[in-house]
Curated annotation (Swiss-Prot):
Protein name per UniProt: Carbamate kinase 1
Gene Ontology molecular functions: ATP binding; carbamate kinase activity
EC number(s) from the headed UniProt entry: 2.7.2.2
PANTHER family the record matches: CARBAMATE KINASE, CARBAMATE KINASE-RELATED
Keyword hit for Ribosomal protein: no
CDD domains for the chain: AAK_CK
A Gene Ontology BP annotation from the UniProt entry: arginine deiminase pathway
Length: 310
């Protein structure tokens, strides 16, 4: 039996609540399949599109005097509840259909970051919708948002993405896992908080990369494997070129060389690779599997996906 952290990509969860719910129902079958094989899993998820949409909608309402503006940390908490609810419900239903008596809990999770992190001076995390270059330029002029081109898919708003330092609710996660609870935690990388005087915490406007927090969580609870589910089947080098090549198996030294060659897009595949390296360096006997959400079953059989080891 292995202990596994499964990190679901926010971009792989669809563009609407309805699409997300259908994708989550299918994902629940694969995740419960891991449980029936005797594995112990903890689930995390991204929230880039979802938190961006929540923030955009609330800002629109505030600009038209239809409600208050909400800080980004609160928007992150809303996205944890929204995505976590759909995951939790789908998992509960699938477990029940399989005759498995197991509780599922979504835990609103805070993650400590450093207020002095240089990421606050260099926004890099894409969130929200994809725009054309013309649309992005117009919104940038109107709202002052920063945009980047995101791996050939269009332009997206970027926000600071500081490094996770510690998971505030870690002991609660451990207790739930030890008591046979299926835990959904660290949604969207966790709500970023900074430590103030007397060890109090305060939310800060940012989005932590969910794969980096998932790697930290995996190390903290001594997992055997980190599974990163995204929108593509493999990790690729020379991505979107005539020389595009899928990596089926690789190791962290090779990946470090590819990072030096700038093979992975910043804010897209790069943080996944950095997270994989971090996880394995903290778990030398562990492995990382990166593949698409809809290919999880085939990837677990070794038929598809990128497997990373030391």
């Amino acid at each position: 039996m292995a202990k596994i952290v499964v990190a679901l990509g926010g971009n792989a969860l669809g563009k609407s609540p309805q699409e997300q719910l259908e994708l989550v129902k299918n994902t629940a079958k694969s995740l419960v399949g891991l449980i029936t094989k005797g594995h112990e899993i903890v689930i995390s998820h991204g929230n880039g599109p979802q938190v961006g949409s929540i923030n955009l909608g609330l800002n629109y309402a505030a600009e038209h005097d239809q409600g208050p503006a909400f800080p980004f940390a609160e928007c992150g908490a809303m996205s944890q509840a929204y995505i976590g609810y759909q995951l939790q419900e789908s998992l509960q239903n699938e477990l029940h259909s399989m005759g498995i008596d197991k509780q599922v809990v979504t835990l609103v999770t805070q993650v400590e970051v450093d207020e002095g992190d240089p990421a606050f001076n260099s926004p890099s995390k894409p969130i929200g919708l994809f725009y054309t270059k013309e649309e992005a330029n117009r919104i940038q002029q109107e709202k002052g948002y920063q945009f980047v081109e995101d791996a050939g898919r269009g332009y997206r708003r970027v926000v600071p993405s500081p490094q996770p330092i510690s998971i505030i609710e870690l002991e609660s996660i451990k207790t739930l896992v030890e008591n046979d609870t299926l835990v959904i935690a660290a949604g969207g990388g966790g709500i970023p908080v900074i430590r103030e005087q007397h060890d109090s915490f305060k939310g800060i406007d940012a989005v932590i990369d969910k794969d980096k927090t998932s790697a930290l969580l995996g190390a903290d609870i001594h997992c055997d494997q980190l599974i990163i589910l995204t929108a593509i089947d493999y990790v690729y080098i020379n991505y979107h070129t005539d020389q595009q090549q899928a990596l089926k198996t690789t190791n962290i030294d090779t990946l470090k060389t590819y990072i030096e060659e700038k093979q992975f897009a910043k804010g897209s595949m790069l943080p996944k690779i950095e997270s994989a390296i971090s996880f394995i360096e903290n778990n030398p006997n562990g492995s990382v599997l990166i593949t698409s959400l809809n290919q999880l079953d085939a990837a677990l059989e070794g038929k598809i996906g990128t497997l990373i080891t030391k």
